[in-house]
Amino acid sequence: MFMADAYLADTVWYVGQIIFIVAICLLVIIVVVAFLATFKLCIQLCGMCNTLVLSPSIYVFNRGRQFYEFYNDVKPPVLDVDDV
């Protein structure tokens, strides 16, 4: 009877160890997946910042330069004081 109790205690201990190891592995997996999801979200936010901030500002800068060059091409020359 004592031997059966010893085997049962050992079995419970081994099962407890297995459950503990599985729980630790699951916890590590959850932490790693959360970190990777956070990293991916940061990358997506940087891409959105590029789309919403950087690209329009470059577009506005280029259009402004085009309008400035066009204006300089079509504006009449400055009159000299003698011509007035």
Swiss-Prot record:
The gene is E. Plays a central role in virus morphogenesis and assembly. Acts as a viroporin and self-assembles in host membranes forming pentameric protein-lipid pores that allow ion transport. Also plays a role in the induction of apoptosis. One of its GO terms (cellular component) is host cell Golgi membrane. Belongs to the betacoronaviruses E protein family. Residues 1-18 are virion surface. One of its GO terms (biological process) is viral budding from Golgi membrane. CDD domains: HKU1-CoV-like_E (cd21532). It comes from Porcine hemagglutinating encephalomyelitis virus (strain 67N) (HEV-67N). PROSITE patterns: COV_E (PS51926). InterPro entries: E_protein_bCoV, E_protein_CoV. Homopentamer. Interacts with membrane protein M in the budding compartment of the host cell, which is located between endoplasmic reticulum and the Golgi complex. Interacts with Nucleoprotein. It is a single-pass type III membrane protein. Keywords: Apoptosis, Host Golgi apparatus, Host membrane, Membrane, Transmembrane, Transmembrane helix. This is Envelope small membrane protein. Residues 40-80 are intravirion. Its main location: host cell. The chain crosses the membrane at residues 19-39. It is found in: Host Golgi apparatus membrane.
